[in-house]
Amino acid sequence: MRDARNKPPHRPHVAAAGLWIYGLHPARAALANKRRRIMRAVLTTRALEEIGAGLLGRVKHQIVDGEAVSRLLPQGAVHQGVALQCEGLPRRDLEETLAATAPGARIVLVLDQISDPHNAGAILRSAAAFGVAAVVVQDRNAPSESGVLAKAASGALDTVPYIDVVNLSRALEKLGELGFWRIALAGDGGQPLADGKIKGDIALVLGSEGSGIRRLVREHCDTAAFIPIDSRMESLNVSNAAAVALYELRR
């Protein structure tokens, strides 16, 4: 039975007008995602050629020049001539999402207090590249779905389940019950990540570059590991650390 405490909170992702997803890769992924409701597309002739009329399907669309697309978006947004006005994706439940995946070699990323959408988006992009089953965040102090997050993820926001929960510690408890070995990635971890020789399902916990993984969250991990780096550098950017760790776990 599903734990009611982990039920996704009733918190809207976006304003009533919807959010704007922009850029060729994010737009293609959104158009291909059956869970994504798209209200309209605004794009240039060149972007239409890149995306293809077939992928647009029956989505209401308008052909404009690049400046018209820019006016719909935050200043400086790199849109490559396309913007989609969308609804936020329906909320996902962690246990239900994992029930639809085959156990044995799954990886779930758990992000603790990583609030920068560029970092979170880059982590999603790596998650897609390495076949991660889900990325889990807390419903506070984590990026909500947005055009910036989608752009940084380069399409992965619409391909990797991005799940927010009320409490990360309880989510880690649930992952433990489901058979996941929970690893905190931290500079003071007990051994290099490569030395763990871990088989089976893994939940990898990443913390913010400033404060790291919170104490209570770390206490819900089975072990802590680190990525060896040159002593002249204190740490890696968290999105770079995620990519290195995922490569190591999949190697």
Residue ranges and their predicted role:
Residues 183-233, 237:
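Active-site/ligand-binding-proximal alpha/beta "capping" segment
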Residues 46-47, 66-69, 139-142, 188, ...:
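Short, ordered loop/turn segments at secondary-structure junctions
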